[in-house]
Amino acid sequence: MEYTGRIIKGVGSFYTLLTDNGEFVCKARGRFRKEGITPVPGDYCRFETGGDGKGCITEILTRKNLLIRPAAANIDKLMIVLSSSLPRPDYCLADKLIMQCELSDITPVILLNKCDEMDRETYEAALAQYKDTGYDIIPVSARDGTGIDRLKAEIAGSTCCFAGQSAVGKSSLMNALAPGLELPVGGLSDKIDRGRHTTRHAQLWQVCGGCM
């Protein structure tokens, strides 16, 4: 039997697809590797299953866009997370992400996280960097809830990804939006004020009336 679904998680060679009939765990046909195509979260696919909850992806439908990092397809908005304290904002990375959005028909939204512990100079410099771009800039705090309701409204009806440096609070923000996720949270290196990488794979969750 053939179904159409959306990939919400990929781990190794196994992909979890969400359909109106529930979730199915599928493998991709070998021809995708030969053609240099890798299924990613957000892809809409056709797949065949014998009815045991397992199946085989037979076709990846036309993508609206494709992000490489994070690996995701058919994205509406990219939440670019900067810290208002430490680690200091990497504007070069943020600008690269914005450029990727512009080339991929994705709306960038800039999140200034950790505003509850902000360094005023860092916060105001980040505002000045992007205030004339026309992009939405949202001060948020995963810790005290500042801006979370506005962020939920941004996600509603959209497929969104979070991107930014390690330790800027991406996982903490997602936990604040959907506490049941319980994503692992990294911290800063005491020596170099840089983040420790904690997120190991890309995944979509249905939250706040949308996907992230």
Predicted region positions:
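Histidine-anchored nucleotide/phosphate-binding helix
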Residues: 92-102, 107
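Switch I (effector-binding) loop of TRAFAC-class P-loop GTPase G-domains
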Residues: 179-212
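Loop/turn-to-beta-strand initiation segments
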Residues: 77, 107, 158, 208-212
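Conserved nucleotide-binding/hydrolysis micro-motifs of P-loop NTPases
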Residues: 51-53, 84-87, 114-118, 143-146, ...
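Conserved beta-strand/loop subsegment of P-loop NTPase cores
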Residues: 75-82, 103-115, 134-140
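Walker A/P-loop
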Residues: 166, 171-172, 176
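N-terminal accessory targeting/assembly segments
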Residues: 1-91
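Canonical P-loop GTPase G-domain recognition
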Residues: 117-168
